[in-house]
Design a protein with these regions (language model features):
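Structured alpha/beta or helical-core interaction and ligand-binding surfaces enriched in interleaved
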Residues: 1-97, 104-122
Length: 122
């Protein structure tokens, strides 16, 4: 499957791969937070300080990884900011696996809300 096809499945997330085929290959999954994607889920913890920014997505992703894909914890790294969720690795397949699983979780708002209930505010 091409990256274009993968990215259609992952919208509004975007998978980017840099320097593919070299020692310096790097893959990143990003979500620019310029829309209200799944804001209603984060609003369930608004009184606790969750606002749906990149750091909150980070907190959700950590719970997701711990519970669903613990084998990826050591190979993925976060580089989120207030307006951007970003996770990446030199292991392109690990980023793809995370991306597909994380997007599937986001498509199930009850699962997403459940995982967010265990997230720790950053």
């Amino acid at each position: 499957m091409s990256y274009e096809e993968i990215n259609k499945q992952l919208e509004p997330f975007k998978l980017m791969v840099f320097d593919e085929g070299t020692e310096d290959v790097w893959a990143t999954l990003v979500l620019w937070l310029n829309e209200d994607y799944k804001q209603n889920v984060f609003d369930t913890r608004l009184e606790e300080g969750f606002v749906g920014n990149g750091y909150d997505w980070n907190s959700l992703a950590i719970v997701f990884l711990e519970e669903k894909m613990p084998e990826l914890m050591e190979v993925l790294s976060f580089d989120s900011e207030a307006g951007l969720f970003s996770i990446g690795s030199e292991d392109v397949e690990a980023v793809k696996k995370f991306a597909v699983g994380f997007k599937a979780m986001c498509n199930d708002e009850s699962e997403m809300t459940d995982l967010l209930s265990r997230a720790i505010l950053d």
